[in-house]
Amino acid sequence: MSPRPLNVGVIGGGKGAFIVHPQQRAIFFDGTRRVTAGALSSNPQTAIEAAENWPFPIQGYASYDAMIAAQKALPEDQKLDYLLIVTPNHAHFDPAMKALKAGIPVFCEKPLCLTLKEAAELVKAVRKYNVPFALAHTYIGHWTSRLSRYIVRSGLLGDVRWVDSSYIQGWLATKLEATGQTQAAWRTNPKLAGGSGCGGDIGTHALMQLRFVTGLDVKEVSAHLETFVAGRKLDDHFTVYCNLSNGGNALVRASQICIGHKNDLGIAISGTLGTLRWRAEEPECLTIHLPNQPDRVYWRSAVSPGDGFLPKETPAELMAEPTLPSGHTEGFHDAFARLHRCFEADVRQWQATGKFVADGSKYATIEDGWMGMAFLETCLKSSGKKGAWMALPRKI
């Protein structure tokens, strides 16, 4: 008999929200997870009304405090197995901390929180209470990101010399927040988004892609945070030169004022033997450039190890993971679903054994979240000193 689906409670995601919708589809993707409850707004009345108008029946709560407190009295099969936090950045820390203290696993939107101090407290809480925690860096959920990770970390490109990791958008090329557009309004508000707008919103994705694929850390930064739209309170253009932990260099860049760009996340990794290129807007394939050879394009579900580049020893688990034939497109929702699927496996193991160990190979961890905040805070300091080189703090 199959185990019952995991029950998921949602914090945030009410009227005007965006990211809750792909997240919710991802939760239901495999039939082994379901949304059963929600505290969908910081306004108690709005939270209850949003739950009543949800596309399917869920238990609505006036606040996340009430939802977390209610778990103690529920039968085991009705308790929440994990919480999904999809609020603006300023409202990540408190519900995450309260859930961890209550022994409820957390799947949190990025960035982790508002400050490095908050991030450090969350890291300590995860370790103290031994509760599963995942951070929603969507793009590492693409299968081609997993293949890229294997290629680079196996040394097939040689030693990494240079990485260009970027996320370019154009939707904030005008002062959209002045029109009352919800997503623009909170992302450009320092009280809700934190110290960096563009960097916190999408620059952290570019950083995570670099770290996930290469396994390298950023040691020093020379950052330039710029605001092109008059009257905007946070950066809308983010450029960071980086020294990497292996002695290589990188450029982590993000922009939200480049007209014509949609969600253009991409990474190019150049090593001593070749270069890998991948773009999230074309997530089904990656390209390998080798000296004096035709380019190699690898498509999901159409990869043949032992082809002269990928070794026969390419992990069978990696090769077997995609379920759709090549040409039937995977996309944004599939990437989210892969993250939730991997987190579900860890939650179930934790429930069965009491042990939780996240190695960072399947989804972003609490330590990745801390590193993202350390990166942002160091970039803010560097930019404030006209791009002066500054070292990131040591890992917590």
Where are these regions (language model features)?
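Glycine-rich, aromatic-lined ligand/substrate-binding cores of catalytic
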Residues: G200-C285
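C-terminal glycine/acidic-rich active-site capping loop/insertion
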Residues: L244, L273-Y363
